[in-house]
Amino acid sequence: MEKSCVSFYGDVNIGADISIDELRESVDAVIYAYGAGTDKRLGIPGEELKGSIAAAELVAWYCGNPDVHPDTDQPAGDRLMAADLQELITSSRHAVVVGVGNVALDVARILIKSVDQLSDTDMADEVLDCFSRNTVTDVHVLGRRGPAYTAFTTKELRELGQIADVDVIVDAADLELDPSSQAVVEQNKVAARNLVVLQEWAARPLSGASKRITFHFWSRPTMIIGDDRVTAVEIERTMIDSNGYVVGRGGGATLPADLVVRSVGYRGLPLVDIPFDDSTGRVPHAEGRVIRDGGVSPDEYVTGWIKRGPTGVIGTNKSDAVETVTSLLADVRDGAVKTHSRSGDLDRLLAQRGIRPLGMPAWHRIDAAELKLGASHGRLRTTLAHRGELLEAAEKEA
């Protein structure tokens, strides 16, 4: 980002400040890398009750996304999400997290930690203040398959067992492997390591800690119970049938719950005038080249989750980007991408509309402001979560 040949345009809304067609006319090629912006639903009764939320909403809030931390001059309706999340954190004892990926683990970890254990993070002040009043004592993590099929990494899993004053509870019976699970563990080193960690926890006596994280494998929610607000979750036991599908097998339980967080995957969203396959939640492509109107677009490319779906880690995104950039460079070499002298076209268009994009100097001023605020609190950094304070920091000279 610091190279002279790279320009950063922050605070520019594609589709509002500038259309896709105008952007394409201002540059030689466009790479779409805007990720998967929404979550997958559970599709069960009670999912709309107060207290049933998406992990994406909760993570955006505690990570300081300004879209979830509106300024006071924004319409009241835009503030409901943050206000509701804060109310849930400070009034819930029992939380149920549905999913067994790294996001689900992160949610469980954040919900169960004390504010002192979160004080070395870069959370915004108002988020830390909310967690100082956190009342959650029990987190239940549900996985519809067995431990061999979890999607988290061992490092993130093991950290849960190192949180002070927290017992991690695992039923040893859930860790018994059927032939298909055994095959997965034998072929997947991460799954094998995760199983060892879970077995250690299952064998470890409880310490009488004041908080608990309980894993429920082979379990899925069938109904969220409550009148105006979540009060419990019905779960059923599951198994994998002969066709490899997860099916119910009877039995189950009712878990007390004040908060239900679904973390069963993300899904891409369409942006105005960008090709989108609603059946997959992705931009259609061929080796990173966007498919538009049934053919390969001559100047549009795609990478990341909006290209392949919400899977993998940073390393996966790197190899994914290599494929896209390789296609772009090949097209430039072969003349499929027409290069023109367009220097300044985008700047002139934005200036004509009175739009002042934030460049890298502005980004550095925001960075400095967050470091300064963090230092004043004895922390490395404190996130600025409101758009107004971000823009103020961006404009402020050192």
Feature annotation, model-predicted:
Residues 1-49, 214-216, 222-235:
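Feature captures the FAD/FMN-dependent oxidoreductase FAD-binding
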Residues 39-133, 283-291:
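Glycine-rich dinucleotide-binding loop and its adjacent helix/turn
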Residues 289-398:
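C-terminal, flexible cofactor-proximal segment of oxidoreductases
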Residues 183-219, 223-276, 354-398:
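C-terminal catalytic lobe of FAD-dependent flavoproteins
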Residues 26-35, 96-98, 255-265:
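Short hydrophobic core segments
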Residues 51-69, 73, 77-84, 224, ...:
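FAD-site-proximal beta/loop scaffold in flavoenzymes
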Residues 51, 105, 109-251, 326-328, ...:
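Dinucleotide-binding/catalytic capping subdomain of oxidoreductase cores
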Residues 22-29, 90-91, 246-258:
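Core beta-strand elements of the Rossmann-like FAD/NAD(P) dinucleotide-binding domain
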